[in-house]
Amino acid sequence: EETFREKSDGPTVETREIKNEKNLSKIHFGDVFAVTYTGKLSVYTNGVNYNVPVRETLFDEGMDVVDFFKGLAPVLGDENKTLIVYGKKDFAYAVSDYGVEIKCKTQDVSLIKYLVDYTERKETFDDVIISKGYNPFTPAYDLFLLYDELYSVLVAQDMKSLYEKVELPLSDILYDMERYGFKADVPALKRLSAEYAAEAETLTKKIYELSGEVFNINSPKQLGEVLFGKMAIGKGKKNAGGYSTTAEVLEKYADRHEIIKYILRYRKVQKFKSTYVEGFLAVADKNTGLIHTRFNQTI
């Protein structure tokens, strides 16, 4: 049987269910409130945990996610309130999709946990509350407890300044960078792609000419057999898949045969073209040329 922990220095939390926008609007929010939005919609404030069933169909009781976030808009827009969430940046994405702006102060428990209880693995909020034995039926209250617990450790370890002056502001900066994106010069990238393609073709012909054989240059096995077998440019280093043809190995034989410099250049050109040039072109918005990436602050 699973056991769940309640706050040891306070009463068992009162739990209520919110099934519509009208009831949500009647919540009296204190100066501090916690919100969970992944898995279960839940709000905790003034000693009460409010669970919000998500309406899946027109006939279900509960609220749509959009109505939940819009119902929170007034308190999220109150600069005198403090919001506790697990993942400030992700929460900002979630509410902004519905036109809701966050102006209240925000505490990000995921960042605090990253600083004081780093585990080297990706953990969701649900993972954390289960591992700590919190009650999964009061998620927002659990979040409040987790904040209370970890923030005390943060202060004790003298990392409050790091959290408030570096990590929290950085989260906002990363969010803005992700939303605005990076401008890519698409025409220039396309020209560069064509130039690299032409150079790769020229290098391929030169390599075939010097080796006296047509083969797959991108195949380490075939390349090794040509260089160390047919051409015998050196003894080579064999492994289970054949001869090793890493850059480090090939550079040792650069003075043995001019084919090596062409192979090394061919690899660089292919790497630049496929990984960077084509990679950027694949993710750049076709209309704006902007590249929108995601930054993970807690790894």
Which residue ranges define each predicted feature?
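Conserved "right-hand" nucleotidyltransferase catalytic core of DNA-directed polymerases
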Residues: E1-M63, D67, G71-G77, K81, ...
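Charged catalytic and DNA/RNA-contacting regions of genome-maintenance
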Residues: Y44-N46, V52, D60, D67-V153, ...
